[in-house]
């Protein structure tokens, strides 16, 4: 059983229950914030995984800071930093506060509350939080470090489409330029015909929408 569509005869794609009936296409954005969702790993690798492990995350932190620091002043002032409910073993939150100030850190208990106030969401992992963001209809991009993520062969095509359409970035300068370009009205880009088709393809492959599950 998998969220992702699999080719094997003995696999079944099932929709994640907590995403059902939540997908939205927004015609306007009430939020004003740039929501930055940080990614976390444990101090020690204790299993095989296709994402950053242990101290790999430190290189990731450098990219995040460079991205945030190079945003235009008017966008930087709208940053809301949110970290997941885990122990901050790598002290990224403390580093963020030292660089930007505590006033930019979210004080909301639920992610949905930050979504409601957001104009654009920056994800840092192709995991559950990204799926949740896609469901909200709020424009989003993913900032990744290229050599720290491994993809199964059947996802390479979708990954490349997301990258060529400026949803996935592995270069922080390119991500900064894109955010600067779309900031005034991110929905012009996000709701374009090309992006809408790509979002539909993403849900079909990675997050099946089916009420009869």
Where are these regions (language model features)?
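Conserved catalytic-core segment of nucleotide-activated headgroup transferases in glycan assembly
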Residues: 14-98
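Active-site and donor-binding regions of nucleotide-sugar-utilizing enzymes
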Residues: 1-18, 130
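Short, acidic/turn-prone active-site loops that include or flank metal/cofactor-
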Residues: 5-6, 17-19, 108-110, 145-150
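Short glycine-rich anion-binding loops that position phosphate/pyrophosphate groups of nucleotides
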Residues: 6, 39-41, 127
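Catalytic binding pocket for nucleotide-activated donors in carbohydrate/polymer assembly enzymes
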Residues: 11-13, 29, 97-100, 120, ...
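Short, intrinsically disordered, charge-balanced linker/junction segments flanking boundaries
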Residues: 1, 208-212
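Redox-cofactor binding/interface segments in oxidoreductases and associated redox assembly factors
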Residues: 2, 36, 81, 123, ...
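Donor nucleotide-activated moiety binding/catalytic core segment of transferases
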Residues: 75-136, 146-147
């Amino acid at each position: 059983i998998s969220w992702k569509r699999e080719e094997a005869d003995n696999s079944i794609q099932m929709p994640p229950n907590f995403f059902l009936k939540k997908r939205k296409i927004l015609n306007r954005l009430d939020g004003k914030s740039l929501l930055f969702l940080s990614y976390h790993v444990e101090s020690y690798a204790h299993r095989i995984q296709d994402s950053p492990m242990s101290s790999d995350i430190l290189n990731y932190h450098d990219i995040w800071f460079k991205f945030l620091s190079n945003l235009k002043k008017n966008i930087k002032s709208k940053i809301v930093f949110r970290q997941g409910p885990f122990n901050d073993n790598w002290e990224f939150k403390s580093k963020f506060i030292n660089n930007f100030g505590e006033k930019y850190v979210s004080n909301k208990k639920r992610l949905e509350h930050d979504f409601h106030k957001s104009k654009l969401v920056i994800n840092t992992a192709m995991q559950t939080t990204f799926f949740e963001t896609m469901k909200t209809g709020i424009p989003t991009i993913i900032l990744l470090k290229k050599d720290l993520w491994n993809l199964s062969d059947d996802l390479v095509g979708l990954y490349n489409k997301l990258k060529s359409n400026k949803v996935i970035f592995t270069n922080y300068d390119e991500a900064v330029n894109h955010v600067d370009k779309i900031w005034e009205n991110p929905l012009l880009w996000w709701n374009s015909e090309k992006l809408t088709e790509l979002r539909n393809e993403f849900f079909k492959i990675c997050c099946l929408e089916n009420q009869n599950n």
